[in-house]
């Protein structure tokens, strides 16, 4: 049995896709289209993409065909829906290959899963959109376990990895991010008050790990700690996730210590420092 993962919610038409000063408008639009196709985990109709982008069908089609010529997207099925192309995978994979991140981390993830008995995730910080993205996972052997797709995005304010990243930002940066992103309520336990969230982040900094207490999905808990690069900047996070029935109040501190230790081990193996 797999614990439920929150369903995707609809997007507003992209009034927010207007480029910031200095950006190339067509490039920004094309990259957003590619991102939306990737998030669909399948294929998307032209009309749906145009609606999400707030663009005419003709403009959307022109952007897509340009990316198709470069191999970033492709058309599939009889209806000609749009899906991610192989070249997007090649480009994206270079992030991991550049420092062989997964080869370093995966054995540590597996050991952490064995020691904790729960599913362990590796997430990286998407600096451009300030979201946590799962790039590796080792699932536990329990019948009831947490499951999330590789490439899945985690909300910064309502996930273990996200709050671990947020805790490393200044109060001004957090305030700015919350102003842009808002505080969506995924469950009744989601921290939707900026004051309460900032208090939670202060506790995270003090103890060294974040704690998601059913804030993203009911019945699930998660602890997470950041991994740092050679510039002392957090770029990834390890997390342990599982059902409340096993991650009891008594186990949270124990698992928190485990994830801190593992994150420090990855930081050192990666050549980073804290």
Curated annotation (Swiss-Prot):
Keywords annotated in UniProt: DNA-binding, Glyoxylate bypass, Repressor, Transcription, Transcription regulation
Coiled-coil region list: none
DNA-binding residues: 46-65
Domain annotation IclR-ED: ranges: 101-272
Domain spans labelled HTH iclR-type: 24-86
Pfam family, one: HTH_IclR
An example Gene Ontology molecular-function term: DNA binding
N-terminal signal peptide: none
Region of interest (Disordered), residue spans: 1-21
Transcription regulation among keywords: yes
Positions of glyoxylate binding: 160-161, 212, 222, 239-241
GO BP of this protein: glyoxylate cycle; negative regulation of DNA-templated transcription
NCBIfam families for this protein: PRK11569.1 (NF008601)
Primary role: Regulation of the glyoxylate bypass operon, which encodes isocitrate lyase, malate synthase as well as isocitrate dehydrogenase kinase/phosphorylase.
Protein name (record): Acetate operon repressor
Organism in which the protein naturally occurs: Salmonella typhimurium (strain LT2 / SGSC1412 / ATCC 700720)
Classification of source organism: Bacteria, Pseudomonadati, Pseudomonadota, Gammaproteobacteria, Enterobacterales
């Amino acid at each position: 049995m797999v614990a439920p993962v929150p369903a995707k919610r609809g997007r507003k038409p992209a009034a927010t896709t207007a480029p910031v000063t200095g950006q190339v408008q067509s490039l920004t639009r094309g990259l957003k289209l590619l991102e939306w196709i990737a998030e669909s985990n399948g294929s998307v109709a032209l009309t749906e993409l145009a609606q999400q982008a707030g663009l005419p069908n003709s403009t959307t089609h022109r952007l897509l065909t340009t990316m198709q010529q470069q191999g970033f997207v492709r058309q599939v099925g009889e209806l000609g829906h749009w899906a991610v192309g192989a070249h997007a995978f090649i480009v994206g994979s270079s992030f991991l290959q550049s420092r062989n991140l997964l080869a370093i981390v995966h054995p540590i993830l597996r050991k952490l899963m064995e020691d904790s008995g729960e599913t362990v995730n590796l997430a990286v910080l998407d600096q451009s959109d300030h979201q946590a993205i799962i790039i590796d996972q080792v699932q536990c052997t329990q019948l009831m376990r947490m499951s999330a797709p590789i490439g899945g995005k985690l909300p910064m304010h309502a996930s273990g990895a996200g709050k671990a990243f947020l805790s490393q930002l200044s109060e001004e940066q957090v305030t700015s991010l919350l102003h842009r992103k808002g505080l969506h309520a995924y469950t009744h336990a989601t921290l939707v008050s900026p004051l309460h969230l900032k208090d939670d982040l202060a506790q995270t900094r003090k103890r060294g790990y974040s704690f998601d207490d059913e804030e993203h999905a009911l019945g699930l808990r998660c602890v997470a700690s950041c991994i740092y690069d050679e510039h002392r900047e957090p770029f990834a996070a390890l997390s342990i996730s599982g059902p409340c029935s096993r991650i009891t109040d008594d186990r949270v501190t124990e698992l928190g210590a485990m994830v801190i230790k593992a994150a420090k081990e990855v930081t050192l193996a990666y050549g980073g420092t804290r």
